[in-house]
């Protein structure tokens, strides 16, 4: 059964461009080989980690959104687990599409001088 998934991968922050392109190619190849449908692959950049992982305080985040079955998730996570450059990964099944949350706008308060003038 084909379902929607998203995966966040944290890799070492000091990887070169060739290694990053190799990681991108690896993920897209796994999804294509397992007959999945890749929707989005985003590089979120280097960010500070909440706690050190393998003596690293920073990590480069990647967001992957795709359609596939359980075998695809199992293979993707197995291959990520074996890669030394990957610090952490987390895959989540998307139950239903949610619209982007609307931006919260703070209510405008009337100035005390404007109230006194009325």
From Swiss-Prot:
The keyword rRNA-binding applies. One of its GO terms (biological process) is translation. Residues 98-118 are annotated as: Disordered. Transmembrane segments: none annotated. GO terms for molecular function: small ribosomal subunit rRNA binding; structural constituent of ribosome. The keyword RNA-binding applies. Pfam families: Ribosomal_S6. Residues 99-118 have a biased composition (Low complexity). Keywords: Ribonucleoprotein, Ribosomal protein, RNA-binding, rRNA-binding. GO terms for cellular component: cytosolic small ribosomal subunit. Belongs to the bacterial ribosomal protein bS6 family. Binds together with bS18 to 16S ribosomal RNA. HAMAP family: Ribosomal_bS6. This is Small ribosomal subunit protein bS6. It comes from Geobacter metallireducens (strain ATCC 53774 / DSM 7210 / GS-15).
């Amino acid at each position: 059964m084909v379902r929607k998934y998203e995966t966040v991968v944290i890799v070492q922050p000091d990887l070169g461009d060739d290694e990053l392109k190799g990681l991108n190619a690896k993920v897209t190849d796994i999804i294509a080989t397992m007959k999945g449908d890749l929707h989005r692959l985003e590089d979120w950049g280097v960010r500070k980690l909440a706690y050190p992982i393998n003596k690293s305080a920073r990590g480069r985040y990647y967001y992957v959104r795709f359609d596939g079955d359980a075998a695809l998730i199992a293979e993707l996570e197995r291959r990520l687990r074996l890669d030394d450059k990957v610090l952490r990964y987390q895959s989540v099944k998307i139950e239903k599409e949610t619209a982007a949350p609307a931006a919260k706008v703070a209510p405008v308060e009337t100035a005390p001088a404007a109230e006194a003038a009325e």
